[in-house]
């Protein structure tokens, strides 16, 4: 159980803070606060809580969740809300934003490598190999120390990609996002992510989740080598924050003992140097930079937040297709490409070697396509390479009429044909799918 410090009885000796093994004890506005998400009762470090032992007045007491309303009297004015039409909002959609979204959603499934300094790096060539984008992950937004172990990448939360997209949307509201900041608080983020409807989650749990996701989205460092394109001169960016976490304001309420309870968070964030080249309105008019943006559906954020545990593959595909569909009405995406995005290269390799893994992956893939269809991302199958015989059953029965008489006629005609809707899949379906394509996906 976490501990808390009643400031009314605290003498301010500061003996406890250096003794805390998790760094949970913090000084906010000359008053002590123990972060309940970091405090673990010194379990795994010491047999007893060190703050209790170090305190001359035995002030620390067990923490209990705050009861009643969480109200913040004074807050800084935040940036205007996104999604003013209730449906969508412009967002920065440059290749650097797309690849960062891939990194946060696909994580260890991507081909990470070790650079010359021994740090983990995700690198992607651009413009037919003439340029490159490289990402490093730091231990925190406040640290410049890059991670060196893949285990750190595996701890990333796919939901951090939603925060990344929200930041990309806020960046489009500024004229010079690489110099200007936007301010967003936990109430706005709860609304965008659908967390305000989660009555099963306490305020403290929501604040902890939002803070962790913001920290992860702001832990990316990007380097870009971009070749000359027409009038646009080539440029190079080395080790720049993708999103700079300028400030985190914590809002507290105190009880009658002086115990501080975290009830709100406000974040000040600024886009990195990349925005000067990919989200520059004035320079775009002068044809010396890009201004690349797309449309972010609000429903995509809430859908990813609701399906990420049971259908991570579908969530990955939704985030990837958000950018892919921007490239044109017809994408002609191969099934292996979709599987690589949804499950990673290693799982596909296992499926190619093992029959049971192959069957399992096929079922998962077809179910994930159904989830996408249910949430408005409808797929158009290529009739040549992806005929009805190898399409998922849900896609084949979608044309069954709802009218009973018409449905009866449909089944009579189906039964008298050479192939039936309920026929089992042909032998070698996996090999057929490896050459199949989906012509397009629609965004919700």
What is the predicted function of each stretch?
Residues 15:
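Residue-level recognition of oxygen-bearing side chains
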Residues 50-54:
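Short, disulfide-bonded extracellular cysteine-rich repeat modules
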Residues 67-444:
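Charged, alpha-helix-forming regions
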Residues 1-12, 23-47, 59, 64:
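Ferredoxin-like iron-sulfur electron-transfer modules
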């Amino acid at each position: 159980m976490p501990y808390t410090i009643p400031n009314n009885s605290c003498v301010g000796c500061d003996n406890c803070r250096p003794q805390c093994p998790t760094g949970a004890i913090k000084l906010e506005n000359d008053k002590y606060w123990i972060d309940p998400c970091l405090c673990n009762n010194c379990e795994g470090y010491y047999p007893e809580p060190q703050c209790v032992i170090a305190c001359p007045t035995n002030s620390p007491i067990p923490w209990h969740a705050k009861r009643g309303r969480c109200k913040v009297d004074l807050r800084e004015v935040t940036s205007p809300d996104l999604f003013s039409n209730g449906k969508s909002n412009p967002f920065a959609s440059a290749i650097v934003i797309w690849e960062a979204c891939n990194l946060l959603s696909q994580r260890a499934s991507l081909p990470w490598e070790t650079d010359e300094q021994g740090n983990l790096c995700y690198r992607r060539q651009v413009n037919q190999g003439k340029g490159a984008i490289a990402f490093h992950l730091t231990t925190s937004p406040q640290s410049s120390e890059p991670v060196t172990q893949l285990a750190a990448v595996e701890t990333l939360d796919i939901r951090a990609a939603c925060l990344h997209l929200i930041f990309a949307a806020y960046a489009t509201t500024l004229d010079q996002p690489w110099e200007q900041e936007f301010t967003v608080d936990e109430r706005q983020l709860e609304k965008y992510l659908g967390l305000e409807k989660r009555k099963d989650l306490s305020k403290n749990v929501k604040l902890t989740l939002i803070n962790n996701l913001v920290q992860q989205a702001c832990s990316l460092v990007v380097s870009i080598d971009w070749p000359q394109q027409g009038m646009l001169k080539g440029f190079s960016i080395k080790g720049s924050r993708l999103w700079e976490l300028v400030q985190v304001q914590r809002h507290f309420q105190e009880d009658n003992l002086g115990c501080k309870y975290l009830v709100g968070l406000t974040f000040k964030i600024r886009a990195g140097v990349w925005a000067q080249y990919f989200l520059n309105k004035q320079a775009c008019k002068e044809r010396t930079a890009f201004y690349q943006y797309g449309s972010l559906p609000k429903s995509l954020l809430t859908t990813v937040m609701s399906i990420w545990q049971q259908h991570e593959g579908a969530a990955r595909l939704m985030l990837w297709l958000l950018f892919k569909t921007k490239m044109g009405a017809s994408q002609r995406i191969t099934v292996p490409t979709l599987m690589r995005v949804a499950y990673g290269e290693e799982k596909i390799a296992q499926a190619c070697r093992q029959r049971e893994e192959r069957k399992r992956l096929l079922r998962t893939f077809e179910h994930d396509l159904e989830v996408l269809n249910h949430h408005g991302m409808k797929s158009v199958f290529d009739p040549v390479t992806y005929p009805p015989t190898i399409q998922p059953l849900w896609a084949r029965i979608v044309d069954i009429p709802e009218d009973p008489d018409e449905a009866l006629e449909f089944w009579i005609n189906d039964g008298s044909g050479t192939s039936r809707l309920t026929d089992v899949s042909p032998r070698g379906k996996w090999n057929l799918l490896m050459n199949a394509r989906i012509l397009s996906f629609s965004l919700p």
